[in-house]
Amino acid sequence: MIQIRHVQPEDRIFWFGLDKHLSQKEFDNKVSSKSGYVLLADDVPVGLLRYSLFWDSIPFCNMLYIDARYQRKGYGKKLMAHWEEEMKAQGYERLLTSTQADEEAQHFYRKLGYQDCGAL
């Protein structure tokens, strides 16, 4: 069974096992602001998503990560859909994310309907 919930303090070890870019302080901020999610498969945490507000007004997915052992099973798609629904329920009409030019993730986001909007 799949469950998606907001990140909680007890997720710290799992979170930092996947996300090497977030500071401890920012993790605590994600917990308190409810701007991070954990996906569990049969009660095992397997994926995460964190976001912030770009220009203080547009939800921006900073990180989507599914444990390599669980990739290509639809978990990333489910986690993105959950985030998109939550953001739309809060009244946001536009969502953003970003990848590097050579990342395989570009194909994933395009399949979800995301469009290229620029590069530097």
What are the roles of these predicted feature ranges?
Residues 96-98, 115-120:
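Conserved catalytic-core motifs of GNAT/GCN5-like acyltransferases
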Residues 2, 6-63, 67, 80, ...:
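Acetyl-CoA-dependent GNAT
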Residues 105:
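Helix-turn-helix
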Residues 64-71, 100:
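A short, internal acetyl-CoA/4′-phosphopantetheine-binding micro-motif in the GNAT/acyltransferase core
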Residues 87-100:
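Conserved GNAT acetyl-CoA-binding A-motif
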Residues 109-110, 114:
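Conserved active-site tyrosine of GNAT-family acetyltransferases
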